[in-house]
Each structure stands twice: as C-alpha cells, then as structure tokens.
UniProtKB/Swiss-Prot annotation:
The lineage of its organism: Bacteria, Pseudomonadati, Pseudomonadota, Gammaproteobacteria, Lysobacterales. This is Glutathione synthetase. Belongs to the prokaryotic GSH synthase family. One of its GO terms (molecular function) is glutathione synthase activity. Residues 125-311 form the ATP-grasp domain.
Length: 314
C-alpha cells in the first residue's frame, strides 16, 4: 500500500546526488510507489497543539543535472499515517532541537518519525559513543583547557574536536610539545566556556575510518573505509577521503552488537557508527551517510532494507 513519505532535509537544490543518502532513500520510496513530500526548510510550526509544515509533492530522478520536481507548497498537518524522514544535517543547535520537539508532537499524532525525535535530542554524535566505554579509545570531554592539555601530554598524540561538528570540520591533530596546542584548545573551548573532546590518536586511521550502517540495530555486512589521502589525517569523505568497501570483521560485529540493541531501543532505526581500528569513535544518528557508495561498490540496496523495516511498522 502506498505511504506518504515526508522528508525534512537541507535544501534539495544543493545536494550532490551521487553521494547523498537522503536522495537514495527518496529514490527507493518512489520506486515503491510511495508518495513523496518535501518540507520547505524552516517551515515546521505548531498551531493549537498540532504540527504543520509547508510541504509540496516531490518527484526525484537519478540525473545529476535535473534530479527533482516540486509541486505547489501547502500548509499540511503532520501526523497520522505519515512516514517522516528527519534528515537535517548538524549542527544540532537550538533550531534543530525545536524541530525535533515539533516532530515529537507529530509522532504523538500518529506519524512514524525516523529517527526518533527524542533520540535525536538525547544522542550527541560524539558523546553517544561514550555510552559504550568498553568500545572507545581513551577520551576526555571537558571545558578545562589544562585538563585537555594534560590528556594530550599523557597520550603523546591526540585528536581534538568540537562536539557539534560534522564532515571533519574543526578537527585537529596535536601532540605533546605542539606550540599550537594552547590556541587550539582556546579555540575549541571558546576560552573554557564550551565542551570539547580529546581522544587518543589512532595510528590505524591510515587504514581507514570505517562507517558501519545499522538498520534497527543490525549491521549491514559491509562497511565503507574512508581512507585519508596525501598528508591528510582525516578520512571523512567531505575532507577528501577515499571510500573503499570492506566486509565487516569479527571485532566490527562485536562493536555493532554492543551498540545496536541500545540504538533500536531508543528508536534510532538508521544509524552510522564510526570505527578506527578496534575502537568506536562516533555514533551518527542525525543523517548517516555512505549508503550510495556501499550500494555502488557492493551491489546492495540499503535503502530497500530500511524501507522493508519501515513498511512492517518496526
């Protein structure tokens, strides 16, 4: 039976369809004859206890110069019978949180929201990994620049990053004796006012930062290793990393088994976990990526697996 699939995303005009996971989900929904609806960015609202948005019928095409057609926008209540894909990219700022609160009201009115709005509020992508300390490298999250500096000195090399970034932005590699360490910490913590994360530098990054996708807590059998290029230490695709598919190894599956059940319990139906060597470094719940690369390299249809789960009601 055709469903109404409503997508909350960043402007569709600016996406790169060859790598865009949201676009792959829309293609799969359309292939299944579901009705696609696009939420005008920034248009979610609440009126007398009901969530509304300016939405338009959407058609998509796998054509890099002409990939979508929109119908007329109209104010529509969100709720009963709708599948809402919440796919806005970070930062998870106040406006993002407000949108998830409005989506919680739509969920209470009968919509199926993916991922669960409460989980999107609760699970910071850097902090969430620390729910599973047995899987993580030595990590310190603090505003205290002195403590962060001592951590770097103890580990000898460390990665320093903000809690609200994505795509490799504002990530620093530092070491004991680095003359720039103080200014890096001042910048990341805003002079001791903002939390920052310090994590032991993992030499295995040269072999790739592995993105493992989970659907309802179960891992896809292949991951995408994002391999830094040249003198770069970041593997993120947005930072120029090269993506190479690999089958999951035994330890990858162990990490997924630690993380997956808790993600499923929280309604996080489509999740990306990042693994370097034997260590979990991040859990991505807002808008996990790398689906299209894995589909292309492994002959998969990951969006189809997600829609199979959605259509059964989860």
């Amino acid at each position: 039976m055709p469903l109404d699939v409503v997508v909350v995303m960043d402007p569709i005009t600016g996406i790169k369809i060859a790598k865009d996971t949201t676009f792959a989900l829309l293609l799969e929904g359309q292939r299944r004859s579901h009705r696609l609806h696009y939420v005008h960015p920034g248009s979610l609202s609440l009126n007398e206890g009901r969530t509304f948005a300016q939405i338009a019928p959407l058609q998509v095409r796998d054509n890099k110069t002409d990939w979508y057609t929109l119908g007329e926008f109209s104010e529509t209540q969100l709720g009963q019978g709708q599948i809402i894909l919440m796919r806005k990219d970070p930062p998870v700022n106040a406006e993002f949180i407000y949108d998830t609160q409005l989506l919680s009201i739509a969920q209470a009115a009968g919509a199926q929201v993916i991922n669960h709005p409460q989980g999107l509020r609760d699970l910071n992508e850097k902090l969430a990994a620390q729910l599973f300390p047995q899987c993580c490298p030595p990590t310190l999250i603090s505003r205290d620049m002195r403590a962060l500096k001592m951590f770097v000195q103890k580990q000898e090399q460390a990665i320093l990053k903000p809690l609200d970034g994505m795509g490799g932005h504002s990530i620093f590699r530092s070491s004991n004796g680095d003359p720039n360490l103080n200014v890096i910490l001042e910048t990341l913590t805003d002079g001791g006012r903002t939390l920052a994360i310090a994590q032991r530098y993992l030499q295995q990054i040269i072999e790739g930062d592995k993105r493992i996708l989970l659907i309802d807590g179960v891992p896809i059998d292949h991951c995408l290793a994002r391999i830094p290029q040249g003198d770069e230490f970041r593997g993120n695709m947005a930072a120029g990393g090269r993506g190479e598919s690999r089958p999951l190894n035994e330890h990858d599956r162990w990490i997924a088994a630690q993380v997956g059940p808790e993600m499923r319990r929280r309604g996080m139906r489509f999740v990306g976990i990042d693994v370097i060597g034997d260590y979990l470094t991040e859990i991505n719940v807002t808008s996990p990526t790398c689906l299209r690369e894995l589909d292309a390299q492994c002959g998969l249809n990951i969006a189809g697996q997600l829609f199979d789960a959605i259509e059964t009601g989860g």
